[in-house]
Every structure is written in structure tokens, then in C-alpha cells.
């Protein structure tokens, strides 16, 4: 099992920091069964925090690259405590800025984490925005080795996350514009989104919405799964060459 | 003129050093040691001594993405393509996504050089009383900036939000390192937070640097972390001393809390503070700048036949002109790298290969030859830009493709030479003359190789007749006669050199070189340097005391260097038997303008187009292709790309997707280039392969940097190649501890700063591989490798000499020879 993990995290209006999806890899030549999750009731999750599969009976996604299984799940049964600790730190303890810029922190408990935050405008959310971040975790106590890997793939990692974030933002914008009829007003609203303050006003008429609904892409999490698997495979692969 | 240009740089730098040093010394008695003006002077002095970028050069922000380092201004496009794989090598790019968000990040970088000088150190202590309104204390705040900028204007209370984060605190007392950007500014904040003896007051060491350095922070992390650790130890030492002092005076009780805020560290520990600041100024910040601003070599894939072609031509050129038939300088140097230093440089991060030369052009050519033997090489695809061929020149191109390089007529080469001389003559500025001289040398280098090879035979009259028949102009006939005469002259001179096979003839030729080498020396040599501080002081003093005489010397040198002479000097250094073309040739060229267009030399790497910056190769194209292929954003329905596997009692159903990654995406090409670079104006400790000016000063810097490397390692090696004196030396430095290893806690804290107090001995061993034209004692394996290299070069020479060989067969054979050199091992 590799020490590198990619997560998609969300700061929920009701539940605070939450993991939406986590992509891990297992040993080469295996099926990665230790990373698969059993059935769980999706009704216990709010819409905002749920990893929504295109097929309702599934709870895990898996693909094989060079005989290595990459598995994406709603939560990680192996690294549950670690990931919870990471997202609490990222969302609650640090001053998180959702501007697509990287934030890196390292300590012996959580390893090396690279966090890139972004937000989506949604009038049904508190403060009219929903906050997410992609997190690359290197679960290792060796800070120098983790930094070396990050250094060797800096443009690839930052650029890879940027591609997925840009895709999500673009299709969210298309969905938002398509939903409302007045194009000029919607563009103005999106542009003004940048100046909204960081205070989240309480409003009980707000409700949770899933990323699939925000982007009108039923297969969004399948794409995220495949893209994260590719990023993970590339980052892991080069470390084995020497 | 090269010496003049470098001397101008040195004089300018010396003047600034002298001025700023004077400012520093005059300010110190009146104001506290750490006032900003004095520190800024020190910063510029140190950075100016270590780096070669022009000081105080303002650049507009819109040019940031296309600005190349000034060090590349004197490099021709062909040499850029050889060394770097691209004509355009901008600075390391800051992340641009911020600019894509409308309204955010309105601040822009206004000055590259000014920003990269500035940094800010903040040491803040946070008390454990959460109810206290002002529970942060500024322990230390230090900014280096003579000019007011955004770094200084941010108040510590604003930075605390990004240093400590929210008041919510984790339950663990773990030490943490953070790297983050600060929104609406061009700053990066590097922070270490730690606790002292598990009390609830947190201490933060923060370093603010410009955002342009963010991509290199990860690569320089060991250096930054070392500085943070050193500072942390220093602060813990202060706290420990304070606690011991309180215990001794009886004021200590179990209820009192030891705080840094109770200690005025500036007043009580000025020496330690200065050491902490100086370490950052002289090691960490220059390292970040070097990695960000100095372009790195690009190692072509070993399967790229255009590169292999150019590489072998460079070797033939070097052996013909520089080595001669008797001396085995280049094969020995290549063998040394293949059998020994290729492995050493990869395993031992402090080992280096340094070329010492007063001639930038020659040194860069040698770097090109040697770098091809090193690792890691790029393994991706090389993008070739398609060339637009006009209809009227297609016939000429078709004719040229049928000719081999060896058969290129001398007429075209000679005319090319005359053209370059004409261009260089029209320039009034001496610096521009120098630039054109280098361009001329680079462009003439490869063509002249063919001319010299033809020197073994009497020029073929048939070729001359063919040229005459092609042209119907009478003026063209006039061009042929002087060119033939010139070719004959060089041919006779070369035959004369080769006929006299006595060793003395080469010795007599070498005796001429010191005169030319002295002309190119960029700076006065210093006999002894104990530290970089001493070097700066001495240089400043010399500059101050002898400014008038040095100005006269510069004037006299400038007057001696006429525009007509400068190409001759550069050519003479490489082609001592070639004469300067006379003025009649220049006049004749003006009568034959159509010929110039048709004889442009087709450089095999001309259409290489690699997107990169000084540090990395761009990943944008790879990510674009991968995203389209893997995520299929234009496809609304992905039902056909996955299937459902039924679950069991352990896990639920699994959605299994296709793996859409083919061989092109399976192995990502190299992104971070190795730390090899070109000719620099100063030796740079952060690069493993480089060239720098010859002289005692450079050698002292190299030795001192090896000693500094031993602060963290027990052993280091360097291969020094001196082109002026024809030396190849293998220098090894080892650290051995002697006596008692027990150290006091004080000395432990200042481990890296009080080297003299450590009980150890530095042992240096120098092995002369090649000295004064003689080969030193070689091991059997090295000797075998030398023979292998020589045989490989001979095979390649025969390959390129044989006109009957098919082009594809020659390419595959050349690739095979190159591959055998690159993968040579002693067992074979």
C-alpha cells in the first residue's frame, strides 16, 4: 500500500470538515480488497458530503494501471483517523484561502500535505458559496523524502489539480448559466462572487447540494477517480525508477 | 574584449561592493546593528558576490513570463538549443492561476531583482492564555529592504493569521512546518511552529520570501529546514540559559513560565542573532535565487539522432582544433566521467565537475560534450517545429539534402565568414562587437570543421567550376579567387603543423596561450581567502585604492581592442592557424547578396521546441493530453467506460473503470532538470556541473565551498578541469574527527557556525589526471575506458567520413556508438 493519497474534502454547512472522496492504491498484483468499503446507507449523508456514484449499488471505484489497483471510496477504513485529522487542520485550524494556491504543511502525525482550496458559487449555501479542497497526502515521517518527491513533480501536481478544478468550475458555470435565463445578471453575480466576505451568515432556508448536481455531470466522480489515479500513478512511478 | 566585458562587470560589482561596504561600516557605530539600511547593504554585497545577475535592473511585470536571465544574453540561438533544448528559457514561473480569477490577486510583481533580495524574518511567541486579547508577542522582526515594499508594509498582526491560523488549536503539541502564499500579495510564508518543554506557549519562526521563489522552495527544502532547525536550537538555547539563570538566582519557581517575550534577544544575544541572519543571507537566499534564475542544461534523449549528430560533430571539432593528434585531453576527460564521475555525481550530491576557463565559448562547448555523458536524461518526445519552405528555395533545399556535410564547398563557408565579419564591423559598441564575435565563432565552428577536414587535400577544382557555372554573375567569380587562396593558405598552415610531429611544436604553441589567457582574466587573483567576507573586503579595498590605475588599464585595453581585431582574437584562440580575412573580401561580399541567402547552415537542432523555464520542463501539454484522454470532458455519458462488479460480505459492489493510460502517458518524462549549468561569472556551490573563470579566486571559492559542504557530510569530491593550463585534477576532501567528541551544549547549538571549535581534521587529496600535457598514472580500468572512448571516437569519425554510407545506416550506427559510451561499465 502506497503512502500517497489524494482526497477531495468539503467544508459542509452543517457537518464541518468532511471527506467526500479518497483515492488510494494497493499492492501491485492484488485486487486491493483491503481498501474496498462495505455497503453503507447513503441516507445518513447529507447531499453536500456524499460521494454520488452513477450506479446506486456501488460504494467503491477501482481501476488498474500497470496491474496496480487504484481505489476511490467515500472514506478510508484504513486511514480514517489520519484523514479526519488532516481536514480538521486544513479547514479549521489554518486560515484557508480558497484561491487555487497551494498550502503545504508537515508534521509527524499527519505527514506532508499539499492542500489546494477552491469554492463554487451557490445561492443555496451559507455565504452563497461552497468550499472544497484537493489534498495530496504523503503519509510518511520523512519530511525530506516527501519534499523531494514534491519537488520532482511540482508542475505536474499543481497543474494536475488545476486542470480538475478548472473543469469543475467551468461545468459549474455552465450549469449555473443554463439554469437562469438572464445571462448578464448571472455573469455579474459570478463576478461579484469574488468580493463576498468570508463570513458565513446563518440562514435556515439553505440546503445542501451535491457536486454532481452543481455541475450537472452524473459522471463527475468517475472522472475525479480516474484523474486522481493517473496523478497518483505518475507520482509513485518515478520514485521507483532509481 | 571578453576580458573587457567581464572586467566591466567586475569593476561595476566592485564599485558597488566598495560603496555599500562603506555605507555599512559608517552606519554601524551610530545605529543598532540591525537597522534596515545597513543590513540591506550587506545583503546586496553578499548577493552581488555570489550571483551574476545585474543589480538594480528594473523589469516590467508584463515581461515576466518571457524574460530570460541576463546570463543568456551572450549566447547564440544554436548554443541555447544545444545546451538547453530551447531558445526561450524564462525564469521559474510563479503559479498563474491566481491571475485567472477575476478580481483576485491584483498585486503584481514590479521588479524581479529587487524582490528577490528582500526577505523578512519574524519570530513570534503565542502565550497560552486564550482569554488574553493580545496573546501574541513579537520577539524578532527583521526586513531587508532599503526601498519600501509590500513585504515590509504588512503588519505582524496580519501575518499572525497565516502563521498560527485560527485560535482553534489542535490537542497535540507537534512541531509543524508550513509553506503558504499570502493572498493579495506576492509573498510566500515559510513557518515552523514548535513548543518549548511541552508548555502551552507556541513559538513560530517565519520567513517571508517573494512568490517567484515558490517553485524552488521544495527543492531547496533541506537548506531551508536546516536554517529553521538552527534558529530553533538558538531560541531553545536562549530559553534554557534563562531558566538556568533564574534557578541560580533563586527566582525560579514551578509556577513561573519561561517565555521568549521576557528576553530581549537583540540586546542580550546580538552575536547569535547576527549569525542566524547571515546564514540566511549568504546560504539560503542565494541558493533559492540560483535554483530559480540560473538556467539548467537539458540532457537530450540518447535516441535523438539530431542531437547525437551535433554531439559527435562537436567532439570532432574539439579534437581537431584543441587537442591535436597527440594529446588525449578530451578522451581522458570523457573516460574519467564515464567510468567514475557519472556515478559519483549521482550518488554524492556535493561532488562537482568544474571547468575553469577564461573563454566562455570554449567552456560552453566542453560543457555540451561532457553533459551528454551524465544522467538523468530526458526520455520524452522532442517537439519538432515544422519549417516553412518557400517555393523558390525548395530546389536549393532539395539539392542540399543530397549533399553530405563533408562535401560542403569551401566557397560557401568562406563567404559566411566574411559576412559575419562584415556584420561585426558595422557595430560601434564594443560590447556588441563581443556578442557578434561569439555569434560568429559559434556559427563558424561547425562549418569550419568541414573546411579543416578538407585541408588534407588540394581544393577540388571541380567544385569551383560547379559554383561558377551555377552563377551567371561576373562579381561572383571575384569571390572565388580570394576564397580559394584563403583555403589554400589555411591548408598549408595545417599541413605544416601536422608535418612537424615534434612535441616541442605543440609546446611552442602552448607558450603563446598565457598571453591571450591573461587578456581574458576577469578579475585580479587573490592569493589567500579565509572566508567570503575577507574576499569582499579585499576586493573592495583593492578597487578603492587603485581605481584610477584600473580605469587607465581599462581604457588602454579598450583602445587596443578595435572592432576589427576582436573577431580575430576570438578566432585565434580556437583556430590559431587561420588568418583574418582582409578588407577586399568584405568589399566583394557586397556585390553578391543573393548568394548569402542560399548558404545558411542548416543546424540539425534548429527546429527543436521545448517548453521550459530555468528549472523545469513544462507539463502543460502532457496534462492537457492526459485530461482529454482520461476524463473525456467532451463526453456526456461514460456508461461504456466502466462495469459493475458484484460485492460480497466484505465489500459492496465495485465500479471498475477502464485504464485509459497508454505508453505515452504511462511514463512521465523528466520534469525537474538536474543541477547542471553553463558558464557562470562566479563559481556557484549549488550546481554540480558548471564552468567559471579561471584563476586563483575561483579555485579558492571551490575549495571553500567543499569545506562548507563538509559541515553536513564527511566526504566530498570535485573534478577540476583547467583549460588554460590543461589540467585535470581530482580533488577529494575528507573530515576526520580527532580527540574527545564530547561537546558542551553551547557548542552543540552553534554546531554549524563555530567550525574552528570542532575537533576534527580536514584531509585533502589531489590526484592529477592530466597535467602539463602529460597523462598521470591511471588505473587499469580507467586506461581501458580511455581506449574505449578513443576507439569509439575513431569509429564515429570513419562513419561520418565515409560518403558512401546510407544516411539512415549512419544515424543508427552513430546512435549505437553513443549508447555504448553512455552505458559503458567497467565489467564490459
Curated annotation (Swiss-Prot), chain A:
GO cellular component, one term: cytoplasm
Top-level taxon of the source organism: Eukaryota
Leader peptide range in chain numbering: none
Pfam annotation, one family: Folliculin
Residue span(s) of domain uDENN FLCN/SMCR8-type: 48-212
Reported phenotype of the disruption mutant: Sensitive to high hydrostatic pressure (mechanical stress).
GO biological process, one term: positive regulation of TORC1 signaling
GO MF assignments: GTPase activator activity
Cross-referenced InterPro entries: FLCN/SMCR8_DENN, Folliculin, Folliculin/SMCR8_longin
Function as written in the Swiss-Prot or TrEMBL entry: Required for the nitrogen-regulated transport of amino acid permeases GAP1 and PUT4 from the Golgi to the cell surface.
Note: Present with 656 molecules/cell in log phase SD medium.
Protein name (database record): Protein LST7
Originating species: Saccharomyces cerevisiae (strain ATCC 204508 / S288c) (Baker's yeast)
Lineage, broadest ranks: Eukaryota, Fungi, Dikarya, Ascomycota, Saccharomycotina
From Swiss-Prot, chain B:
Gene disruption: observed consequences: Sensitive to high hydrostatic pressure (mechanical stress).
Region (Disordered): 1-25, 392-411, 423-444, 538-569
Pfam families to which the protein is assigned, alphabetical: Longin_2
Residues recorded with modification Phosphoserine: 401
Stretches assigned to the dDENN FNIP1/2-type domain: 718-825
Record field: compositional bias (Low complexity): 543-562
Residues of the cDENN FNIP1/2-type domain: 310-712
Superkingdom of origin: Eukaryota
Domain named uDENN FNIP1/2-type: residues: 114-302
Keywords from the named record: Amino-acid transport, Phosphoprotein, Protein transport, Transport
Family, as annotated: Belongs to the LST4 family.
Protein name: Protein LST4
Organism: Saccharomyces cerevisiae (strain ATCC 204508 / S288c)
